[in-house]
Design a protein with these regions (language model features):
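Short S/T/G/P-rich N-terminal loop/turn motif that feeds into the first structured element of a domain
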Residues: 1-53, 60-74, 83-135
C-alpha cells in the first residue's frame, strides 16, 4: 500500500476577516469535496483567539496533492487576497515529488517548510467513520 501524502499549513487570518473566512470556508470545502474524490481528509482548525487557521489534508498519494494544487490555484489566490495574511508554517509528510515540493516552496515563500518523506510504518483507515465498536 502506498503511504499517504499529508499536508499541514498554518496561516494568519487578516484582522477583521474571521467571519468572512468562516462564511467562505464551507463553500470551498464543498468545491473540494465535489471535485476531488481521491482526497481522504480536508479540514481546517481555528486557534482559540481566531487569528490563525490550520489546514490539514490527507491525500492517498502525492499525485492527488498535485491535482489538488492545480485545481485550487484561483481559490488560494482569492483566499490570500481576501482572508489570509500570511503563512506561519507548512509541513509535508510522506513520499513527494520534485514538482509537488516546488509548488509547496512557492506557496510557502519565506515561511518554514518542513518535509518528512520517509514513513516508518502505520496505517490509514479510510472508512473509519463507518466502523463501530463491538461490546
Amino acid at each position: 500500500m502506498t503511504e499517504p501524502f499529508i499536508f499541514i499549513g498554518a496561516y494568519t487570518i487578516k484582522e477583521g476577516k474571521l467571519e468572512d473566512f468562516k462564511r467562505y470556508w464551507p463553500e470551498f470545502v464543498d468545491f473540494v469535496e465535489e471535485t476531488e474524490p481521491r482526497l481522504i481528509a480536508f479540514n481546517a482548525y481555528l486557534s482559540e483567539d481566531g487569528t490563525e487557521v490550520g489546514i490539514v489534508q490527507v491525500h492517498p498519494d502525492v499525485s492527488s496533492m498535485e491535482f489538488h494544487m492545480k485545481l485550487i490555484r484561483e481559490h488560494v489566490e482569492h483566499a490570500f487576497a481576501e482572508f489570509l495574511d500570511r503563512g506561519t508554517g507548512m509541513q509535508i509528510y510522506g513520499p513527494s515529488s520534485d514538482s509537488a515540493l516546488e509548488m509547496m516552496r512557492q506557496l510557502a515563500g519565506p515561511v518554514p517548510l518542513t518535509v518528512k518523506p520517509h514513513g516508518v510504518g502505520g496505517f490509514t483507515r479510510s472508512a473509519a467513520e463507518q466502523a463501530h465498536v463491538v461490546s
